[in-house]
Amino acid sequence: MDAALLLNVEGVKKTILHGGTGELPNFITGSRVIFHFRTMKCDEERTVIDDSRQVDQPMHIIIGNMFKLEVWEILLTSMRVHEVAEFWCDTIHTGVYPILSRSLRQMAQGKDPTEWHVHTCGLANMFAYHTLGYEDLDELQKEPQPLIFVIELLQVDAPSDYQRETWNLSNHEKMKVVPVLHGEGNRLFKLGRYEEASSKYQEAIICLRNLQTKEKPWEVQWLKLEKMINTLTLNYCQCLLKKEEYYEVLEHTSDILRHHPGIVKAYYVRARAHAEVWNEAEAKADLQKVLELEPSMQKAVRRELRLLENRMAEKQEEERLRCRNMLSQGATQPPTEPPAEPHTAPPAELSTGPPAEPPAELPLSPGHSLQH
């Protein structure tokens, strides 16, 4: 093991455990760096916090892309391919590690770490919710401490050697790709390819959310991005309506209206979702709000009210038939024999049978198009 090497960076010490091959790679902006890592505490047991090899999932970052844990870019750009090195990093570099670790664990579990529908960035969420969902990370968050990173550099790719995902793009590139994704989503929606369309809208939303975290909330540029996000989210919700994912529509539209109570289309889309799950009063209230804010949509609102009335009538008729069938089945069953011996226990409560299942879903109205 080589002696500890200072990287000329305050609060960082490096120890090479296994030498790499070749020259130092050409780390330029946009280079993709792939590596395995293990994170440990500086206690006597060197307690392991995270280990990418345990989930068989190498990590990668893009140079110059403002990675959450900036010190990792410094560490990696000091290494050769196949080198294994241990880095001691002081608290000034490790304060945001719990947030990064949470995202990595979510990815390993197959969850979406971007949480694109959340209005605040990761750092703000940390203070808003007070917990990261993992006891060890909450402890690190509460009491930041130096950490040890053991890193093995596997591969370095030039920007032209790989297909860049949208989240890897620069801010300027993200702004340019959003209208492209938006237009592609609209095209796919018109073709009835709702799953693909929803993916395009979601990808555009992720880009805009990322850009929005760099702006001051409620100022002009932030609000401009927010308006674009809301438009895309409502288009995404229309895909969800077509896929019959009504409760997710209710979640997204309600979130929009909590922050922006004057968006007509959010009320309209939410009304349609309420109607699909037989929330009659809520659907009517939202449609009434649409009329108050946009009287020119009276024709569309009347159509939705007729559909709602038909759906509720069909539901009531099906429930009447179900009850009638249950009563007729009960009347034809032979009486049960009394028990052989009397007992003193109180009689069991009579079961009313399983709750009525909702009727089959009716087809959605082709009605009012809200695509942009």
Swiss-Prot record:
Keywords: Cytoplasm, Nucleus, Repeat, TPR repeat. The gene is AIPL1. Residues 335-345 have a biased composition (Pro residues). The keyword Cytoplasm applies. The keyword Repeat applies. It comes from Papio cynocephalus. Residues 53-145 form the PPIase FKBP-type domain. TPR repeats lie at residues 178-211, 230-263, 264-297. InterPro entries: AIP/AIPL1/TTC9, PPIase_AIP, PPIase_dom_sf, TPR-like_helical_dom_sf, TPR_rpt. Residues 315-372 are annotated as: Disordered. Interacts with NUB1. It is found in: Cytoplasm; Nucleus. It comes from the Eukaryota. PANTHER family: ARYL HYDROCARBON RECEPTOR INTERACTING PROTEIN RELATED (PTHR11242), ARYL-HYDROCARBON-INTERACTING PROTEIN-LIKE 1 (PTHR11242:SF2). SMART domains: TPR (SM00028). May be important in protein trafficking and/or protein folding and stabilization. This is Aryl-hydrocarbon-interacting protein-like 1. GO terms for molecular function: peptidyl-prolyl cis-trans isomerase activity. One of its GO terms (cellular component) is nucleus.
